[in-house]
Swiss-Prot record:
Zinc finger (C2H2-type): 95-117
Entries under Pfam families matching the protein: zf-C2H2_6
Organismal lineage: Eukaryota, Viridiplantae, Streptophyta, Embryophyta, Tracheophyta
Protein encoded by which gene: ZFP8
The protein's name: Zinc finger protein 8
Subcellular location(s) of the protein: Nucleus
Function: Probable transcription factor required for the initiation of inflorescence trichomes in response to gibberellin and cytokinin. Is not involved in the regulation of trichome branching. Is functionally equivalent to GIS2. Acts as a negative regulator of abscisic acid (ABA) signaling during germination and early seedling development.
Amino acid sequence: MDETNGRRETHDFMNVNVESFSQLPFIRRTPPKEKAAIIRLFGQELVGDNSDNLSAEPSDHQTTTKNDESSENIKDKDKEKDKDKDKDNNNNRRFECHYCFRNFPTSQALGGHQNAHKRERQHAKRGSMTSYLHHHQPHDPHHIYGFLNNHHHRHYPSWTTEARSYYGGGGHQTPSYYSRNTLAPPSSNPPTINGSPLGLWRVPPSTSTNTIQGVYSSSPASAFRSHEQETNKEPNNWPYRLMKPNVQDHVSLDLHL
């Protein structure tokens, strides 16, 4: 269309008388169209204008930068919101004591308060323990061990009480804690060996009270001294005299301790 119009105009100018070139109109030629650059990609030819490509590249770059900036701004805003929420939660959070149910603003304050409660309870337990030990079993020197080990009975040797409980050495009675481990009295039928009855230990009446009182004396040194003196005076009667009624000769008993 442009070429035909140009030809018509030139044809009209030929018919018109023109005195000078200045009267001629100025007509610009249309620029020739550049051939589109051919791009081969994976064996296929792609045709596109360079101008379009150049204009598209900066626009894409601008859009990507705008998207990046918007995403960063959104992330920053989200972080600020999270920080504000954490601050609000910390301000609203209360640490409650398990003992008195009081609220504290920080965990450090709560820890110190609970440690004070624990110390008070330990002191209270110690005070209750000492009061219990003071009121229960005050006359027993071993009441502490009896409370801890549940051991309420004393254990004394039984040989000191067998003679007095069985055969009545004197009219003096022994204390109650000396007579707990006594044996039962012998039966009417004494034990026999090969048909012969065994003899029984008997305490002579002359030495029963003195010897046993010497054993029960408070000081052990005096008890052993009286024991040695009486054994030197009466060697045949100390410590006990064995009565053997109708014992056969062929029966021999070893009664040495």
